[in-house]
């Protein structure tokens, strides 16, 4: 079970633990992941994701899953998120209205 965000692909990062005496030892910083269900208003579907806290805040700030995916570059999304983005784009092209 990997600790990677399903939308952005953000994984664990590495750095140093610094003691009081300024000794440095390598350590890993894990991503703060949450199991969430995000709703696509355009597709009228629910999607389950393991999402980092930062990504969840960004999705809420952008106005929901649909608007986040449409306004985010595909290079910044995982394969799973790109597939959902493609479904949303196709639905918008068929005439489903996007509410802002």
UniProtKB/Swiss-Prot annotation:
Listed GO biological process terms: translation
GO function terms (MF aspect): structural constituent of ribosome
Keywords noted in UniProt: Ribonucleoprotein, Ribosomal protein
Keyword Ribonucleoprotein: yes
UniProt xrefs under Pfam families: Ribosomal_L28
Lineage: superkingdom: Bacteria
GO CC term (a single one): cytosolic large ribosomal subunit
SUPFAM superfamilies listed in its UniProt record: L28p-like (SSF143800)
PANTHER family named among the record's database cross-references: 39S RIBOSOMAL PROTEIN L28, MITOCHONDRIAL, LARGE RIBOSOMAL SUBUNIT PROTEIN BL28M
Family per record: Belongs to the bacterial ribosomal protein bL28 family.
Protein known as: Large ribosomal subunit protein bL28
Protein's organism: Ehrlichia chaffeensis (strain ATCC CRL-10679 / Arkansas)
Lineage of origin: Bacteria, Pseudomonadati, Pseudomonadota, Alphaproteobacteria, Rickettsiales
